[in-house]
Amino acid sequence: MTAPTTGPVPWANRLTKLLNQFHAVHGGDRFPVDVEMLIRQTPEQFQTGEPIAIQGQAMDPEFEGALFNLNAGQPDKGNWAIIYNQAISSLGRIRFTLAHELGHYLVHRHLQESFNCSEADMLHWDSTERKMEGEADLFASYLLMPIDDYRKQVTSNTVDLDVLGGCADRYGVSLTAAILKWLEFTPKRAVLVMSRNGVVQWACGSESGKWLSIALNKKLPNGQRRNLSEQSATVLHAGANVDRYGTEVDARVWFPSEPAGMALREMRIVSDQYRQTMTLLILPQEIKPWERDQSDEDDADDTDDNGGLENAFDRILNGQPPVR
């Protein structure tokens, strides 16, 4: 088997360039990406000599997809197959899974002969497998949601679940995948929180919000995951499954170290199918601790100055000279 020479992002960018050129000449919808067509044409396009077959089957709900070599044990005779779970109801998840397996084919097929991908398996992957799975996800996200195009879809300063949902529809992916991609490039301080039964399962932050997500992902001293605050809108309005535009909440409800008076915007969608709640938090620009201290000092100075003026006026009114 010929070893690929580039990583997940360069491979995705190469395919993106080819797709842009194809649609510029032949027209048709650029998005969502027809991943099945791309998979079938990739071996010929890049002359790998290792064809890929695709087959969907109804399988266990936890299984998502797999890539394996039908000629295992025969070097340089790769004949690959991708199997995906046809029982998954979300076409966006299926599209992402297929792109993920294509990423394994392009980036990792020289490293091993089979890739079995399911969320449950993550608990048992070693560091090498985790790295490869992360790279396959990265490839899929760049292929399906090119950042330069994504930026053009999010031009308003106000971002909500309607805006991001429109991007999910454009790219034919799940809302979760669309939000995670947005977090990669947004300058906003934002965190996506996935919870189940009021307990944080995981959190992912933007570049400026990564420390906030780290705080939510950190387990308690007893080893348990953190509960959502009882004062969060997600808990207070648990009966309402959707809040696409957001409710203003004191930032300290979620992040106690944030300054007093700061409010964040909390949006959420409850998925009955997956028995979990997705909450998106968007915060104002960070106020550094030393900036808070300076602000407090300025407030104190203002108070002292005003107090001094009041005392001086009082003395004058009382016929006394002001203190100099």
Short names for language-model regions:
Residues 1-324:
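Active-site hotspot residues in diverse enzymes, especially metal/ion-binding acidic/histidine motifs
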